[in-house]
Amino acid sequence: MRGTAAVALQPAEEDTRIQTADGSGADSVALPPGLQTVYFGNGCFWGRQKDFVDVEMKQLGRKPEQLTALVGYAAGTRTGPDGKVCYVYSDPRTHYDALGHAEVVQLGLSTDPGVAKAEIRAFASRYFDQFRKTPGGMQRLDPQDKGPAYRNVIGIPGGVNSPFFRIIQEENKYGMKLQEGRGNAMSWRGPTEDDILNTVWVVDSSQLPFYRAERYHQFHNGLGKVFPMEYLRDLRNLVSGQGRIEPTGCPELPF
């Protein structure tokens, strides 16, 4: 997004591992009631949010008040004090990258199995469209953003054991490696789940929950792309009015 994130390692003596699988400490208001959480990450989350909003509105027929695409952090094994996961303009103990998380876009799926399968297929198809061919394999659209904070990751309930995983495999049109992940942990040795060309980590979103990003990251222009005011202002104001992008307790920049 803004170059390789600088990782400040967390003190080893402070145990802030994610303790529960029920989303404790994670965002509890980002999704409308009755939906299940999935997330997709591959580089800077700004432009990816717009891509998924387009899928929701144009392919799934969701109305603006029904949209679920929000940016945040996920797939790390730790949180900061008080369960916080923040961008890097904050207490170093809460930095998302140092805690092992990646930038992702959260999306909501119906609890109806048939509907959910159609939704995850649409999201997965768009996700794999967000890569381009290179001599070394499939590269994301913003390769200047490097490191585990920008790694390719998909979070679905149950991970590779999810019934959705087969759909992910079917939509993997370029044959990228789908690698089972258990969450990235940062240490002096480096990441346990790194940013690897042509590889997508697939994790269990019920074990590794989504942490909503700060308000100023939501409905943002893309890298080198200016989006319409209907997206930047009107849609953001609507979602804000629903109470779904309230301050997270992390430092905020002008909104």
Predicted regions and their residues:
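Flexible coil/turn and secondary-structure edge motifs
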Residues: 2-255
